[in-house]
Amino acid sequence: VNATDSAESGDAFSGKRVLVTGAGKGIGRATAVLLAARGASVVALSRSADDLRTLERAIGCETYAVDLADAAAARAAAQAAQPVDLLVNNAGIARLQPFLECDVQAFDETMAVNVRAAMIVGQVCASSMIERGVGGAIVNVSSISAQIGFALHAAYCASKAALDALTRVMAVELGPHGIRVNAVNPTVTLTPMAEQAWSDPAKASQMLSRIPLNRFAQPEEVAQTIAYLLGDEARMVNGVSLAVDGGFLAR
């Protein structure tokens, strides 16, 4: 069996325990389903207990309902999930406001979920890996919004740029311990959150016109990229922000 066959089959992540935040919907759920299908033991975090129940029925995962905007709760949930070999920091929120009307509460909550929670959960998981003397891999789910200024997305764009920067620092500091850290940066991905943000046909068509492949991403396509970065095939990939954008950033 060659590496490609193994990666596509049910054993690529056999024996690996992976923590996925924001696993209730969208990219996080698609990632949890894909990794479970490839043999991983999945631990799913989401603030929606209902979403976790349906996911648990689907893939038999361990679940923790938690609001990652709460720093203490985020740390406690991450600690309860240990030990893990792989981490996907996917949880994210978007509060759409014009810059001049962007309020402090929305800005702080966005940074808390999109950046601070990734730091906290990453600290817990990496500390456990180091204590156990094992390597691992972490993928932070960012966005092309880290590099592009989108109207109404001040807090969101700022949070994703911060997440990319955090990814690079994590890669530098954790690399010597055999822990790789990378980011994926999707274009608009057809998740419940994105479908709300891009429901205006005029806004959507303008965005599509900037994507050479002329379509938005599917959650499963982002999940497959995450799986690549987590897997042995990417064992020399560390500290990158990998666009999954149909060529948007190439223009």
Where does each model-flagged region fall?
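Conserved glycine-rich cofactor-binding loop
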Residues: 24-25
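Substrate-binding pocket helix/loop in short-chain dehydrogenase/reductase
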Residues: 98-99, 103-108, 207
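Active-site loop immediately N-terminal to the catalytic Tyr-X3-Lys motif
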Residues: 100, 148-154, 176, 214, ...
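C-terminal substrate-recognition "lid" of short-chain dehydrogenase/reductases
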Residues: 119, 180, 215-244, 249-250
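Active-site helix of classical SDR
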Residues: 122, 159, 167
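Alpha-helical segment proximal to the catalytic Tyr-Lys
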Residues: 127, 172-176, 235
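Residue(s) in the substrate-gating loop at a strand-loop-helix junction
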Residues: 143
